[in-house]
Amino acid sequence: MKLKDLIGKASIHKNKTIAVAHAEDEEVIRAVKLAAEHLSARFLLTGDSKKLNELTSSMQGHQVEIVHANTPEESAKLAVRAVHHKTADVLMKGNVPTSVLLKAVLNRQEGLRSASVLSHVAVFDIPDFDRLMFVTDSAMNIAPSLEELRQILQNAVHVAHAVGNNMPKAAALAAVETVNPKMEATVNAAALAQMYKRGQIKGCIVDGPLALDNAVSQIAAAQKKISGDVAGNADILLVPTIEAGNILYKSLIYFAKASVAAVITGAKAPIALTSRADSAENKLYSIALAICASEEYTH
């Protein structure tokens, strides 16, 4: 499966509305136009109405609704409110700082806070690689505890299910594949593997600790005599800290030239999270991923 296949999967889910917080950005609007064309999605755009009317002048009236906002903070609040009141299905980050958007998301009155940990799931389409790779969490949780890691992994499993991988293989990553009490990542990874065996993590297969090479390469796993369903075949890479995840994320983009879609999950609705450096195509993939993930919230 490739990221472009998400377009077909998302297009099955008709009449989804995406609320875009502070959509005053040409690349964001390009992605909005592509999504309106290919996904039959509708958009609620918050921001300066004059600028947004100019940017969306070529779109049909039924495809877009514009809600005026004077500041990024107001834009974020209005977009989140629309999802909170179920007039939109998905929230999308526009030209607004992530911290501002998340402040609105976590508002106790009209936000999207749930009992779950919020976490970031990135889905990579890597050239010459035979499957999509899910990486979590490279953007939200700095140094998650064991219980937070369990929830982060479970969030990623829900996203994998949403795109059609019904039993993903998850590798709890560390620097080495043996347990070392002085290396917390190896201890947590081993605990997660045991939690899976005891039924505390569902909908996937978990192993760890695994180093990156023997998680994704069957050759590397065989050389180190590491066996099991996950070794060499991982779909989900659960990183121990935000530093490890962020470096892996950017390495895949800048060195491996991977395409990426990203979503924040664990809230009451999925959040398509894109960076300003993302192309319109990658933003489109994130919208498609969030639409697919939104179906998990209805079941």
UniProtKB/Swiss-Prot annotation:
<dbReference type="InterPro" id="IPR012147">
    <property type="entry name" value="P_Ac_Bu_trans"/>
</dbReference>
<dbReference type="InterPro" id="IPR050500">
    <property type="entry name" value="Phos_Acetyltrans/Butyryltrans"/>
</dbReference>
<protein>
    <recommendedName>
        <fullName>Probable phosphate butyryltransferase</fullName>
        <ecNumber>2.3.1.19</ecNumber>
    </recommendedName>
</protein>
<keyword id="KW-0012">Acyltransferase</keyword>
<dbReference type="InterPro" id="IPR002505">
    <property type="entry name" value="PTA_PTB"/>
</dbReference>
<comment type="similarity">
    <text>Belongs to the phosphate acetyltransferase and butyryltransferase family.</text>
</comment>
<dbReference type="Pfam" id="PF01515">
    <property type="entry name" value="PTA_PTB"/>
</dbReference>
<keyword id="KW-0808">Transferase</keyword>
<comment type="function">
    <text>Catalyzes the conversion of butyryl-CoA through butyryl phosphate to butyrate.</text>
</comment>
<dbReference type="GO" id="GO:0019605">
    <property type="term" value="P:butyrate metabolic process"/>
</dbReference>
<dbReference type="InterPro" id="IPR014079">
    <property type="entry name" value="Phosphate_butyryltransferase"/>
</dbReference>
<dbReference type="GO" id="GO:0050182">
    <property type="term" value="F:phosphate butyryltransferase activity"/>
</dbReference>
